[in-house]
């Protein structure tokens, strides 16, 4: 859980920086001064923005090339693309059939689905409720991400792996806060509100992500598990993004679409909790054994 706290915290920090930077890059006032410098190849604002993004990606590539190899034994991978795809789907099904893996995968998938669309929701809400421009609203997206980072760090210090499922009820509260967001129309309320909502998300995702990777590592290895996790998370981002876009496309206001989005989160988290309780009732021995494995490998000194 502590390792996941660091990983998620740094990931969310990068999101904060990306959102704030993106908000500044679309500000026409910035490029008025930059274009006046007469830099070669930078004749339009889009040229400068793309050049900066390419530079950032280049720096990231250099960092990735310097990551040291570990001594962990790698599991063999099929060389043929067809066999590789079949192996992926087997791993996907295996993780969804695991009594703890399915719960943690469902929770983290939903969280990242919400997180991936949160920036668009906050932009739309800030424009409708606070009459903010895109640049101004981008700072509020950063506020949500800041809260998520804080929640991730707190969870890494307070939640043990074998108690990860205890944070799931907070998911319903997070969805309810999304619904309540439509009633917030003052900045002094919005900032702590968004920080708290982000912190809830961070507090949920770190222990559940740690539990998911623990089960994935035991079932199929870390690499395959991460591939399955990312596939499901990206699919959820697309699905929830389509839901939000379809809602606004059908004529719903930004407030109504956000409320619908939050209601979907509440219902989804309630169903995941019912699913977990069903597993506890009907697969008690298996759940207890899996929790013993988690406790044994992550027991405090």
Each model region followed by its residue ranges:
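MFS-fold secondary transporters
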Residues: 63-64, 180-181, 197, 272
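Small-residue hotspots at the loop-to-helix junctions and early N-terminal turns
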Residues: 5, 134-142, 227, 258
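Hydrophobic residues within the alpha-helical transmembrane core of Major Facilitator Superfamily
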Residues: 58, 109, 146, 179-180, ...
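Helix-loop junctions on the cytosolic side of multi-pass membrane transporters
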Residues: 45-46, 50-80, 161, 273-286
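A single, central transmembrane helix in multi-pass transporters
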Residues: 13, 20, 26, 31-50, ...
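Helix-to-loop junctions at the C-terminal end of transmembrane segments
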Residues: 26, 150-164, 248-249
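C-terminal ends and interior cores of transmembrane alpha-helices
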Residues: 172-186
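Substrate-agnostic recognition of the 12-TM MFS/MFS-like secondary transporter fold
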Residues: 1-27, 103, 111-120, 144, ...
